[in-house]
A protein has these predicted regions:
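Short helical segment in ABC ATPase nucleotide-binding domains corresponding to the A-loop/adjacent helical element
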Residues: 95-103, 116
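The feature captures the beta-strand-to-loop junction immediately N-terminal to the Walker
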Residues: 40-42
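Conserved ABC ATPase signature
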Residues: 135-140
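Helix-to-loop junction immediately C-terminal to a conserved catalytic motif
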Residues: 55
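Conserved ABC transporter NBD signature motif
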Residues: 63-75, 111
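Short beta-strand immediately N-terminal to the Walker A/P-loop
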Residues: 37-38, 81
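Conserved ABC ATPase "signature" region
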Residues: 110-131
Length: 140
């Protein structure tokens, strides 16, 4: 059986004033379809970095990620991340904040009208249609 997720020799480093800071060094993980895996570790050990690479929000410095035998190079509609410390851009409306992500994920596959409909549909799913034009400080 092929792996559902294959993280293959993933390295990640970030530039700093003192040179590259290596945060991941040759990470390997294979997950079969239906299998559940937890990443456990202390703060700062790279768990979120691995998940951001799998989500397509970051590109590994070396190595790669395959999801259902397709290389992950950008965010996609088949993956989602719930951030620990989320924030909305205070100068944008609820609709505009959500639309940023929708445009990023679907810009190549959906028309402008389809992205508008998708944004409104998903805000309706979480009962936020009434707040489309409100700024984050106007909702609770």
């Amino acid at each position: 059986m092929n792996e559902y997720l294959n993280i293959d020799h993933v390295h990640m480093s970030f530039p700093t004033d003192k040179g590259p800071l290596e945060v991941l060094n040759s990470i390997n993980l294979k997950v079969k379809k239906g299998e559940f895996v937890s990443l456990i570790g202390h703060s700062g050990c790279g768990k979120s970095t691995v998940l951001n690479i799998v989500a397509g929000l970051l590109n590994a410095t070396q190595g790669g990620v395959l999801l259902e035998d397709k290389e992950v190079t950008e965010p996609g509609p088949d993956r989602a991340v719930v951030f620990q410390n989320h924030s909305l851009l205070p100068w944008l409306t609820v609709y505009e904040n959500v639309r940023l992500a929708v445009d990023q994920v679907f810009k190549k596959t959906k028309s402008k009208q389809e992205r508008d409909e998708w944004t409104r549909h998903n805000l309706e799913l979480v009962h936020m249609s009434h707040a489309l034009d409100r700024k984050p400080d106007e909702i609770s």
